[in-house]
Curated annotation (Swiss-Prot):
Biased composition (Basic and acidic residues): 541-557, 607-616
Organism the protein comes from: Homo sapiens (Human)
EC number: 2.7.11.1
Tissue expression remark: Highest expression in adult heart, followed by pancreas, skeletal muscle, brain, testis, retina, liver, kidney, lung and placenta. Present in most primary carcinomas.
Name of the protein this chain belongs to: Serine/threonine-protein kinase Nek4
Domain Protein kinase: 6-261
Main location: other
Source lineage: Eukaryota, Metazoa, Chordata, Craniata, Vertebrata
GO terms for biological process, alphabetical: cell division; DNA damage response; mitotic cell cycle; positive regulation of DNA-templated transcription; protein phosphorylation; regulation of cellular senescence
Modified residue annotations for Phosphoserine: S340, S343, S461, S563, S723
Listed Low complexity bias regions: 591-606
Co-factor requirement: Mn(2+)
Catalytic activity from the UniProt record: L-seryl-[protein] + ATP = O-phospho-L-seryl-[protein] + ADP + H(+); L-threonyl-[protein] + ATP = O-phospho-L-threonyl-[protein] + ADP + H(+)
Record text on subunit structure and interactions: Interacts with RPGRIP1 and RPGRIP1L.
């Protein structure tokens, strides 16, 4: 029995035919209400009404209509209807709780719009509610309106059909009901006006001591005083909805197109946007924040772990230098002492993240040449020591292209920086320590382990980060003891430039040729550059062939981090660089970096499982289909491939650089679009869903808010100038499906190209054709004739002229615009306008 699946909680009220019980589903744990309708002693009319309510609810799906779960007829003669539970109670009780204190106008209009959207949905389904009142309007925990109690609703076959049954609540009944006149959807508009008036004044719109006086007040059309605490637009809208004549009342669709209503909807969406942002901040959902905010926070966290070392006894200094093309923050400056952690953090945080014209760093470091027998081992260790941290940081900041060109030159030139440990800035690679005293790298190992779980800071030295902006330290740093001429003889300038062009897409990173820097700063061994470029291209082609080494290389990297540290070699004589050994070292380094790239793919694959969609994966798939086998890798892989080889991108190879910048810009742009769509609330739905959490009732409430925001956004986009309110049909006849463009009001406003194709109607026997079909066919033929004769633009102007109040002026202007066609099409245009305003198909 279905009732056994629910756990009884309490009775929450009594409806028209039975009681309403709050229950809890045993499986999903959600709360529902079961409406038990006693049909044992009910009349045939009441039985039909109860069955109709269950049938209607099962077909209706709208954010502002009570949700339907299931229904069944028990053996005890009761009809059970399971519906969603509205924790806020009904609107009537909510207004009573105000105790005479008026609601804010935005709250009144918010509820008003939600009730109107529910009525519009019902009317599009050809359903009259016929008992709309504040007791049948419910509120959820998040103040979302739910219209319910469709027990006496009636489904009309056509909009021109009228219902003449005298049912409803007297306070909300329209004058035509008491006069026993036919009525249609305008009766629900009257009831809607009564509800809005009650929300605004906390009183019934029409009230009297007895029923006779109440009926007399409604029939005579004596309007109650309009509320003065609200704007005149709202008062005028209430007055039109409570017009005595049904034809003078606006339809629900026209109500939602009023400029005042659309303005209030925009205010509601803006307030929801702000509330969503606060919820995102409160819940700490970093994915719902804008991408720039996340990156900014990451950049700050990278500087929190900076611990300055004491100065050496030699009095070495750190210089901050800049090129002429840099901005104001890149101007040359020098500091005799290292800054404190607070000053360092303040300095780095002042970097302009929106700067798009910064250049990369130009760094000069001391170079130590390893002995021939120890080059391979130290080079491998140097790469493996730095690579895992770089990989983790790449996984943390997917849109950042990090280009470590000093690292490249040191590896390819078989060199290694040797600065005093006291001069070492920890944001650089922790493996670059002095070689003069042969101190191990062990003192800096805890910093590596501390950075990984905390902020995954990028530790390659010196690094360039491009994510639409230059995120890392773009100030130019030069490390080394400059107080003696001997130290200057050991300095070889290792250079790299990263131009972030203003006219390029945000985040575009282009690697320029090394020779563009001042020629005095070129390294001594630049003669091996062509071979290194070929090696780099060969390495990039080999990256796609080592997927099988992912896990093994990853374990080797972690195992190496725990191995004993190696001592740095002593200073050799500068200039004795063996090109053959350098190439051999490049081969060894290529194997290590290739394995590291494979491990980065594994880490990327594991991290991509945490997100529903990955822009990098989509971009990678698209590139694999469009590009040749030599196409550039995605953002993170491109960063690693640049960090591995020791030569910047050649100028005769612009295509891989462009692919790299395209990867960077597209990935960042998609992330920003995703977050902005969350902030703009037309796509704010996923942001709200994340902020509220995917747990039980919170997720259900979030989905309801998302659906409401989507619906209000669609309502806000309705054209207020459209006077043709064609309601779509649930199941239109096939012959009209082919020609819906003639009923679409977009064609009347020039938004759809006019097509003058002829309509061929399928002949139906008149015996089986209902009256509504005949009228529909006539209107279609009339519309086709008018559009052909006048055209879309002229017909739109004629519609505007027909709105003129002065009849004489209207006819004169119609003659001027229509010219010769006035005699033939003036009457047809009036007829078409009348049918489109008063009949819905």
């Amino acid at each position: 029995m279905p009732l056994a699946a629910y756990c009884y909680l309490r009775v929450v009220g009594k409806g028209s035919y039975g009681e309403v019980t709050l229950v809890k589903h045993r499986r999903d744990g959600k709360q529902y209400v079961i409406k038990k309708l006693n049909l044992r002693n009910a009349s045939s009319r009441e039985r039909r009404a109860a069955e109709q309510e269950a049938q209607l609810l099962s077909q209706l799906k709208h954010p502002n209509i009570v949700t339907y779960k299931e229904s069944w007829e028990g053996g005890d003669g009761l009809l059970y209807i399971v519906m969603g539970f509205c924790e806020g109670g009904d609107l009537y009780r909510k207004l009573k709780e105000q105790k005479g204190q008026l609601l804010p106008e935005n709250q009144v209009v918010e509820w008003f719009v939600q009730i109107a959207m529910a009525l519009q949905y019902l009317h599009e389904k050809h359903i009259l509610h016929r008992d709309l009142k504040t007791q049948n309007v419910f509120l959820t925990r998040t103040n979302i309106i739910k219209v319910g109690d469709l027990g006496i609703a009636r489904v009309l076959e056509n909009h021109c059909d009228m219902a003449s049954t005298l049912i409803g609540t007297p306070y909300y009944m329209s004058p035509e009901l008491f006069s026993n006149k036919p009525y249609n959807y305008k009766s629900d508009v009257w009831a809607l006006g009564c509800c809005v008036y009650e929300m605004a004044t906390l009183k019934h719109a029409f009230n009297a001591k007895d029923m006779n006086s109440l009926v007399y007040r409604i029939i005579e059309g004596k309007l109650p005083p309009m509320p003065r605490d609200y704007s005149p637009e709202l008062a005028e809208l209430i007055r039109t909805m409570l017009s005595k004549r049904p034809e003078e009342r606006p339809s629900v669709r026209s109500i939602l197109r009023q400029p005042y209503i659309k303005r209030q909807i925009s205010f509601f969406l803006e307030a929801t946007k702000i509330k969503t942002s606060k919820n995102n901040i409160k819940n700490g959902d970093s994915q719902s924040k804008p991408f720039a905010t996340v990156v900014s926070g990451e950049a700050e966290s990278n500087h929190e772990v900076i611990h300055p070392q004491p100065l050496s006894s030699e009095g070495s200094q750190t210089y901050i230098m800049g090129e002429g093309k840099c901005l104001s923050q890149e101007k040359p400056r020098a500091s005799g002492l290292l800054k404190s952690p607070a000053s360092l953090k303040a300095h780095t945080c002042k970097q302009d993240l929106s700067n798009t014209t910064e250049l990369a760093t130009i760094s000069s470091v001391n170079i130590d040449i390893l002995p021939a027998k120890g080059r391979d081992s130290v080079s491998d260790g140097f790469v493996q020591e730095n690579q895992p941290r770089y990989l983790d940081a790449s996984n943390e900041l997917g849109g950042i292209c990090s280009i470590s060109q000093v690292e490249e030159e040191m590896l390819q030139d078989n060199t290694k920086s040797s600065a005093q440990p006291e001069n070492l800035i920890p944001m650089w690679s922790s493996d670059i320590v002095t070689g003069e005293k042969n101190e191990p790298v062990k003192p800096l190992q805890p910093l590596i382990k501390e950075q990984k779980p905390k902020d995954q800071s990028l530790a390659l030295s010196p690094k360039l980060e491009c994510s639409g902006t230059i995120l890392a330290h773009s100030n130019l740093r030069l490390l080394g003891s400059s107080d003696s001429p001997a130290s200057a003889s050991r300095v070889a300038g290792i250079t790299g430039v990263c131009h972030h062009a203003q006219d390029q897409v945000a985040g575009e990173c282009i690697i320029e040729k090394q020779g563009r820097i001042h020629p005095d700063l070129q390294p001594h061994n630049s003669g091996s550059e062509p071979s290194l470029s070929r090696q780099r291209r060969q390495k990039r082609r080999e990256q796609t062939e080592h997927r099988g080494e992912k896990r093994q290389v990853r374990r080797d990297l972690f195992a190496f981090q725990e191995s004993p540290p190696r001592f740095l070699p002593s200073h050799p004589i500068v200039g004795k660089v063996d090109v053959t050994s350098t190439q051999k070292e490049a081969e060894n380094q290529r194997r290590v970096v290739t394995g590291s790239v494979s491990s980065s793919r594994s880490s990327e694959m594991s991290s991509s499982k945490d997100r529903p969609l990955s822009a990098r994966e989509r971009r990678r798939l698209k590139q694999s289909q469009e590009e040749m086998s030599s196409s550039g890798p995605s953002v993170r892989k491109a960063s690693l491939s640049v960090a591995g080889p020791g030569k910047p991108q050649e100028e005769d190879q612009p295509l891989p650089a462009r692919r790299l910048s395209s990867d960077c810009s597209v990935t960042q742009e998609r992330k920003q679009i995703h977050c902005l769509s969350e902030d703009e609330l037309s796509s704010s739905t996923s942001s709200t869903d994340k902020s509220d959490g995917d747990y039980g009732e919170g997720k259900g409430q979030t989905n309801e808010i998302n659906a409401l925001v989507q619906l209000m956004t669609q309502t806000l986009k309705l054209d207020s100038k459209e006077s043709c309110e064609d309601v779509p049909v649930a199941n239109p006849v096939s012959e009209f499906k082919l020609h819906r463009k003639y009923r679409d009001t977009l064609i009347l406003h020039g938004k759809v190209a006019e097509e003058a194709e002829e309509i061929h109607f399928k002949e139906l026997p008149s015996a089986i054709m209902p009256g509504s079909e005949k009228i529909r066919r006539l209107v279609e033929v009339l519309r086709t004739d008018v559009i052909r004769g006048l055209g879309v633009q002229l017909l739109e102007q004629v519609y505007d002229l027909l709105e003129e109040e002065d009849e004489f002026d209207r006819e004169v202007r119609l003659r001027e615009h229509m010219g010769e066609k006035y005699t033939t099409y003036s009457v047809k245009a009036r007829q078409l306008k009348f049918f489109e305003e008063n009949m819905n198909f």
